[in-house]
Amino acid sequence: MNKCYSCGGEIKVIKDKPYHYNECGLDVVLCGITQYDCPSCGEKYASIPNMQKLHRLIGVYICQKRKALLKPEEIKFLRKDLHLKAKELAAMLGVTVSTVSRWENGKKEIGEAYDRLLRSVYMMYASEQANHMICGGVLNMFKELPAKRKKIEHSKELVLNPQEWLNCLPECCPV
């Protein structure tokens, strides 16, 4: 890529700067990503390899590593990565569309049971995508979650290198 997609001007290649991947709706930092900057029009691009694997790794990370109740942006990310509309997720979980909407916009906190169910659904989806019938990690993940969890106001950002989603998905859910 030598020319800007927007204006056709020469672009500057950036390889040593972390990329804040906020397009997914979460606070994710990708290291080792080639970025492009057009000084002429100000347009910025990033070259992110294998988005499907990246999103799967982020989803599995949320389900297995985040011990607090799911945050609104995490619920929305999981739903979108499941390729579900809010109406479809609501039907799957046995709640109303307005409940899913309130979870996703932060007006209502997701309950413990629905949090666990959404994580379970996502992990089974990730497992099916990896050609496994049942993901053994789901039960272990639920066992590791405390019965009562506190809300975390300021979570740490997730920092990832391409090797983590290109080569090293958890054994439970390789893509």
What is each stretch, according to the model?
Residues 120-175:
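Long C-terminal interaction/binding lobes of large macromolecular proteins
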Residues 80, 91:
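Alpha-helical residues within the helix-turn-helix
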Residues 107-119:
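Short, basic-rich loop-to-helix N-cap that marks the start of a DNA-contacting helix
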Residues 1-63:
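N-terminal cysteine/histidine-rich coordination modules
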Residues 75, 86, 97:
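Helix-turn-helix DNA-binding elements, focusing on the entry/boundary residues of the two helices
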Residues 94-110:
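Recognition helix of helix-turn-helix/homeodomain-like DNA-binding domains
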Residues 59-79:
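A short, Lys/Arg-rich alpha-helix, primarily the initiator
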Residues 87-90, 100:
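Short alpha-helical "recognition helix" segments of helix-turn-helix
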